[in-house]
Amino acid sequence: MAHHEPIGLIAPNTGLAQLNERSRDIFRQIVESYLATGEPVGSRNISRLISMPLSPASVRNVMADLEQLGLIYAPHTSAGRLPTELGLRFFVDALMQVGDLTEPERQSIQAQLSSVGRAQTVEAALGEALTRLSGLTRAAAVVLTAKSNVRLKHLEFVRLEPERALVILVAEDGQVENRVLALPPGVPSSALTEASNFLNARIRGRTLAEARLELETMLSQDRTELDQLTQKVISAGIASWSGGDGEDRQLIVRGHANLLEDLHAMEDLERVRRLFDDLETKRGVVDLLGRAESAEGVRIFIGSENKLFSLSGSSTIIAPYSDGAGHIVGVLGVIGPTRLNYARVIPMVDYTARIVSQMLGG
C-alpha cells in the first residue's frame, strides 16, 4: 500500500500523541459515527459503543479533553460532538486502519480498464477509470493529465510582426500546435533561425515536459553558446508552452452527482455548489492536483488544508500515475465530503493509479 503524507499539522510532541487508550477509543467512535451518519454523537451513545465500561459522565469528561485539544467540537444545534478537520487528519494519520481491496474489486477495476485501454484512446481509458472510481467511492473522481504525452518532432518560429512570432510545434504523430509568442525588442531573423536550430537539435523524440526541463536547466546554468537575444527567444518559447493557466493540462471529472447525495443542511448544498463552480472553471484544481506530481503514493487533503480553492468541508484523495518509462504523467483521485470512507477510498485510488500506470506502460 502506498503511503499517504501527513500535511504536518500534528507534531509528535503535542498532546495528541499522548492520548491514552480510553481517549483514543472514544475519539475513534466519534469519528466512525460521523463517517457513517454525518450526525453528531453524544456521550450516552458513545458509552454504549466503546469496548470498555464507562458511564456517560466519564465519557463527557474525556470528550471535554478532546475538545480542548481541538479534535472535536459541538455544533450549535446539538449536544453531540463532531470531529474537526484537525481531528479527521489525526484519525487518518494515526488511528485509521487502511484495508486492502477485495479480490473481486481488484479484478473488476483491472478487467474494465484493460479492455478499454486496448480498444480506445488514453483519454477514453482515463474517463472510464474515473467513472469506475466515482461509482465505487460515491464521490466525484478527477484526473489531471497532459493534453498529450506524444513525442515532439519539429519546431519552427514564424515572425508575424517585429515583436510577435508564431511558434509551430509538430509532434511525431502529426499533431500540430500553434502559439503566438511575444518577442523581445530588437530580435533579428537570424536569432529566430538560431533558436529553431538549437531547439530542434534537442526536442526531437522527447515529450514537452522532458524538453522543457532540459532546456530550462541548460539556460539556467548558461551551458549554451547562444547570444542573449537568442536565449531570450528560447526562454519566451518555453514560457509559451508552460501552460501556467492550465492550458496544457486536461482536467476530466466524473460523478458530480455523487456530491449531491446525503446532504444534511443548506450549508452542505452551498459547499457543493461552490465545489461544482470550481470544478467547472478549473480554478485551483489544476494547482492542487499538480502538487501530487512531485510525490509518490497517495496524498490526502482534508478540508481547509487545501487553500487553493473552496474545499472547506471537502476532502481530496489523489495519487500520481506514470507512463512506460516510469515518468509521472498525471494525477487521479476523488473529491468528496470530509466524511469520505477513507479506509476504503485510499486503497481504491492507489490501486486505480497503479492499474492506469500499468496500462500506459503497455
UniProtKB/Swiss-Prot annotation:
A single BP term in Gene Ontology: negative regulation of DNA-templated transcription
Family: Belongs to the HrcA family.
Species this protein is from: Rhodopseudomonas palustris (strain HaA2)
Function statement: Negative regulator of class I heat shock genes (grpE-dnaK-dnaJ and groELS operons). Prevents heat-shock induction of these operons.
Encoding gene per record: hrcA
HAMAP family: HrcA
An example Gene Ontology molecular-function term: DNA binding
UniProt keyword terms in alphabetical order: Repressor, Stress response, Transcription, Transcription regulation
Keyword set includes Cell inner membrane: no
UniProt-listed InterPro entries: GAF-like_dom_sf, HrcA, HrcA_C, WH-like_DNA-bd_sf, WH_DNA-bd_sf, WHTH_transcript_rep_HrcA_IDD
UniProt name for this protein: Heat-inducible transcription repressor HrcA
